[in-house]
Structure formats: structure tokens, C-alpha cells
């Protein structure tokens, strides 16, 4: 799903559905999808040459769980083809036929493979695998996914879980430092957010950029040291701004400012000389203004309207959770008015609520929100099942309220 540059590498073969002239129809494949289709094509060619029988060769559907995980974790657009890949992988997981490493990761995350859904892949398994590459060596995550030994898989999954806990701590510290820098008296508001700190960890800047983008709703770049004289940044954008196009414009307006960059509409990475950051930040801001004609952005909240009371239950929540939702194919978001009967902070940064609508009472949670709400609210929310002591109930996950 990454877009190639103007000049392609001098190679015998380039496999990228987004390169000019490629007729492969699914342009939103993650890297794992590209290699999966390449393996299918290779097997077909080996069958044609007689290396395998017409229906012989390796059973590649045995890899569908890994393909699903990679597709969701890479946050690619879930078009029809990607949803098919994820659906096949989830079905394999729910049947219990999954790689030992995935089974171990489900265990350390406290999730049940037989009820696997896209949320598990994107928010429970994916971050634990990625944590190794962010803070240490990605080979641990690869080894966990590829081992056939159940005991080794569990040992590695536990190590990945510990690394992920460390990642959360580092990310929280960096996020607080970034917010403090944004709130400094000399921090001029602009169309973008662009931050750098010499003490930040290179592997976590993308997560910090994502958090800042959500908070300020602007294209965001966060940088950390990447060598003696270089800094490397990771960016996250909003639907109104194509991030790679912005960086391409900066590179054309200021040819020596960016040493290298790549990415797509919603995310990108780049490298600068450390001494060039003060010049880059305003150039980035100016490029966004030039491409969009705007200096501020507001999120547009699209909902599916009010949910009839008869459908606000655990059964419907369970049906929704079994579907494939994600980037470009969001889960239903409902909009209703509630009375707030009780509210309290849990984990210091999440708001736990007891809500009332007519004769119905609901438990609800707003992740990452620590401000109290008025007695009456209009809330945009999603349904999810909550399992506690063997009892299944419906919980509302608040996305916006006021």
C-alpha cells in the first residue's frame, strides 16, 4: 500500500501493486498480502512447470492467520480483498488451527482465540509483536510467529508482553513531554504539529505522532535521534491531508532539506539532518497550507444515527464484534442522548460511566478521556460485549461526547 517514488530502484523485479502499469486490482495490500499473493503465483508457476502436481504444493491457506494479523496490524484500508483475507484468517483462528506463536500471544493478552476479532489483532497481538522492533530486535517477534514449539512460543510471547509494557511507559513519558512542548508560551499554533526531543526513543515516535494527531487533529510528525547528525521522524495524518504528497512538496520546494522519505496518505517516515529541524518545521507547515488552502482542521464525526433500544444488547454487540472492521471500513457508530448516573476514572486516564436512556442502564467507557461529563450528554458510541465472571453484558465504548 506504500506508494513508489518517482524513480524506481534498478532491480530485476519489483513487486508492488501501486507501481505504474501494474494491473493487480487490490492496491491496498499490506506487505504480508503482497508476499502471500507472490507465493500463490510462485506455486501456480511451479505447478505449470511440473514441479508440483496440478493440485500439489504447500497448503498456503495454513498461513491465513498470519496474513490476517499482518493486514490488520499494518492498518491498511480494509477493501473487499483485504476483508476477505482477514475473514479467512479469523475463521482459522476461531477453529483453533492457529500458529503456536499466535496462540501464545492470545494467552498473554488474556484473549480467547475462538472468539477472535479484528480488535484482538490490532490492539492486543499487533502491539506486542511490534514492541520488539520498537525497543529491541524485531527477530524476537518473528521467532515467536514462526516457531512450531508451543513452550518456546509461550516463553517468547511473555517476553514480548514485558517489552510491550516497557513500551507503554516510554510512550506515556514522551507523550507528556510533547504535550508540554505544545503548551509552552512560545509554541505558535499552526496547521501542523512537528516535535523533536533529543531524549526520545526512535521506536516510539510513530505512536506519539498518532496520539498527538488524535488530540490536535492536525498532520503530525515526531522526531527522535537516529545517529550522530541525523534525526528520523514518523508521521500520522488526517483524511484531509495526504502526508506523502506534503513531504514530496517540501522536498521539491527545499531540495536539500529532507534526506529521504516514504509513505502514503495517512502515514510516512523521513530522515533529516539534526541541524535542519528548525527549517523543516515551518516548511512542513507551509506545504500543508499550500496543498489544502487551510490552516486549521476539524474532525467530521460520521455516525449511523440512533440505535433502537431493542438492539442495544449483548447479542447484537456479539454479532458486530464477529465482523471485520477497521481502517476504511469502520464499525457502526451510534449517536444517542443519555443521562450520566455515575462516572469515575479508572487507570488514571479512562472514564468509566453508568448511563441511562429511557428504561435502559448501560456501563460505558471512554478510553483516553479523563475529564468529567455533564449530567446530560449526546454520545457517539460503539457496542461491545463485556465478559465478567462468566456473565456477558453489553458495554458502550464512547468515541465522542458532549
Residue ranges and their predicted role:
Residues 343-347, 367-371, 384-395:
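Single-stranded nucleic-acid-binding OB-fold domains
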Residues 2-7, 13, 21-23, 227-230, ...:
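Short gly/pro/ser/thr-enriched loop/turn and capping motifs at secondary-structure boundaries
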Residues 262, 320, 339, 374-387:
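OB-fold and OB-like beta-barrel modules that bind single-stranded nucleic acids
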Residues 298-362:
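Accessory interdomain/linker segments of ATP-dependent helicases and helicase-like nucleic-acid enzymes
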Residues 276-281, 376-402:
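OB-fold single-stranded nucleic acid-binding module
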Residues 8-51, 60-67, 263:
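Short alpha-helices
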Residues 44-276, 282, 296, 302, ...:
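Hydrophobic helix-and-loop "lid/oligomerization" segment in the mid-to-C-terminal part
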Residues 248, 356-372:
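Beta-strand/loop nucleic-acid-binding surfaces
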